[in-house]
Amino acid sequence: MAKEKFERKKPHVNVGTIGHVDHGKTTLTAAITTIMAKKYGGTAKAYDQIDAAPEERERGITISTAHVEYESASRHYAHVDCPGHADYVKNMITGAAQMDGAILVVSAADGPMPQTREHILLSRQVGVPYIVVFMNKADMVDDPELLELVEMEVRDLLSSYDFPGDDIPIVVGSALKALEGEDSDIGVKAIEKLVETMDSYIPEPVRNIDKPFLLPIEDVFSISGRGTVVTGRVESGIVKVGEEVEIVGIRDTQKTTCTGVEMFRKLLDEGRAGDNVGVLLRGTKRDEVERGQVLAKPGTIKPHTKFEAEVYVLSKEEGGRHTPFFNGYRPQFYFRTTDVTGTCDLPSGVEMVMPGDNVQLVVSLHAPIAMDEGLRFAIREGGRTVGAGVVAKIIE
């Protein structure tokens, strides 16, 4: 079957469903694709097509994720839905599915449950910027006071994790009724309202090209008579010939000037996000730069050594450790292009971390790395990946 082409005239936004098991995430996903396909084109996806999500491997971690897409009046959405709780944990920590916003699904019949809380916490830790709520299974609740009670609980829970609980939009409906085509306030209309809410509440993400210039350094060469060239793929922004740049990480930050940009042996005026380039640096010696540092627009990124991280530890089946680790564990942390040794402090009351667990750690690196909150990393032992993590909060 030929895939239907989306007209890419609309801005693109990445979202996903989160929430407790059996609260209706997958049914809601099916309902959105079905109703939006009727209105704006695209392919409707049935529940079992989404539920049988294929396994993917991201940094050696096995994750089952369903990817669907649909259009609204003003946008093109890519939407992820995971079959199991562990898949969400892995997905959010590895950043396999970056979310510009999340749809938190809460059953009106049950209210918030343990995974509701855990997914909100994960969203906070990994930097999901916006959450909208779909209160599902409204057809099973007759008492409007009960709906209000659940709404208050959800708002309190969101506020307790530093989301704006009082302002977050909550749409009440029944994904099942909508999927069955019932055109009531809790049926099809609720789904349309939810998508309109996503359009208005979740802002369009800043494109990579519009962010400040950043290039993780992969290699360093000296070219006689020209100076030092660093190579790598521009992660974000634009660098123009003649601009000042900073070399950040591992050593003290240095300022220098970009005197040339080269791609495929051709000289360019600038390097843009996504380009694999060589950047010529004025007056910088070959031994003053190394792999693992970044080239960045001055003042936009700082080196840090200590941070709080949300970490997923690979299970034995995924090729991870066979044994737990304890406080003071010292693996390598792989950031962008290089490994740095660091020490882990476990939260109080946590004796050890088992393979397959997710945990919050405080990491102290032995050398500073250019980082912002939200930066992903791998945890390695002798070149073998044993975990994945994300910088949740910078300490120093």
From Swiss-Prot:
GO cellular component terms, A-Z: cytosol
Keyword Nucleotide-binding in annotation: yes
Protein's UniProt name: Elongation factor Tu
Chain residue ranges for the region called G4: 136-139
Top-rank taxon, per record: Bacteria
Species whose genome carries this gene: Legionella pneumophila subsp. pneumophila (strain Philadelphia 1 / ATCC 33152 / DSM 7513)
CDD domains: EF_Tu, EFTU_II, EFTU_III
Gene Ontology MF terms: GTP binding; GTPase activity; guanosine tetraphosphate binding; translation elongation factor activity
Annotated family: Belongs to the TRAFAC class translation factor GTPase superfamily. Classic translation factor GTPase family. EF-Tu/EF-1A subfamily.
